[in-house]
Amino acid sequence: MYAIIKHSGKQYKVSVGDELKLDHFEAESKASIEVSEVLAINDKELKVGAPFVAGAKVVLEVINHGKDKKVVIYKKRRRKDSKLKRGFRRQFTRVVVKDIKA
């Protein structure tokens, strides 16, 4: 059994027990989150929503929050003695799929 969910503008294919790294959102650790934006669900037969499957929910549990590795952005303009170096660390929320309700 799997489901395709939409969270913060991105789509994820999930099954029970899967661990996901989603974009950061405000929630406490060990909190349960219900996602009702289920695009498709496969439980013996495939149900595709228009745009969402009616009555379907996916229950997620927040494990922790964190930051990815730093991405360094470096720009250099040749012969101009001009350069720019910046770093960026994306924040994420790690969740585990507890239940899929059809």
UniProtKB/Swiss-Prot annotation:
UniProt-recorded Gene Ontology molecular function terms: rRNA binding; structural constituent of ribosome
A GO cellular component annotation in the UniProt record: ribosome
Pfam families, per database record: Ribosomal_L21p
Keyword terms of this UniProt record: Ribonucleoprotein, Ribosomal protein, RNA-binding, rRNA-binding
GO biological process, one term: translation
Top-rank taxon, per record: Bacteria
PROSITE patterns, A to Z: RIBOSOMAL_L21
Task of the protein: This protein binds to 23S rRNA in the presence of protein L20.
Family: Belongs to the bacterial ribosomal protein bL21 family.
PANTHER family, sorted: 50S RIBOSOMAL PROTEIN L21, LARGE RIBOSOMAL SUBUNIT PROTEIN BL21M
Oligomeric form and interacting partners: Part of the 50S ribosomal subunit. Contacts protein L20.
NCBIfam families found in the cross-reference section: L21 (TIGR00061)
Protein name from the UniProt record: Large ribosomal subunit protein bL21
Organism of provenance: Campylobacter jejuni subsp. jejuni serotype O:2 (strain ATCC 700819 / NCTC 11168)
